[in-house]
Amino acid sequence: FGFFAKILIAPAFCTQNSVATELIAMAEQLGAMAYIDAPIGTTYAQALAGRGPAGTINFNTSSDRVRLCYPHVKVYDPVLNAERLEPLSARAAGLRAKVDLDKGFWWSSSNQELAGVIGVERQLSAMIDDPQSEVDLLNEQGITTVFSSYGSGFRLWGNRTAAWPT
């Protein structure tokens, strides 16, 4: 149709370095945004350390075409009649598309409710007035995360790309 995708995801597969590298290359070539998850089971400390040159996860990039996502989220699976983990990238990319359509591409997807999310893989400290909370420290390293506070539901938290803080 003459259009190229502007939101690129490969949920679950993007935790592999080879897939993450190709997503980044495609995003750079197309002027798109790639959403990349930390591997399931990644700790808060590993997510932060993954941003550095000695990182052991797939977060070692400084591309302004990448949104790094941590942690996985819990969703209800009606087939299993139970909750299951899902990569945050799928929900974050869907929310980005929804915000683009509803409010415009210039509107932030941060602090917008993540529909269908009922929990997170790992609890993170989150206080709206505490810059030392885990969600804010993740944002300082260019990692998009999930914030839940004051009965507002689970919200995507963070506007920065992987280019931050370089």
Label each PLM-derived region with a short phrase.
Residues 1-166:
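A glycine- and small-residue-enriched flexible loop/hinge signal that marks low-structured segments
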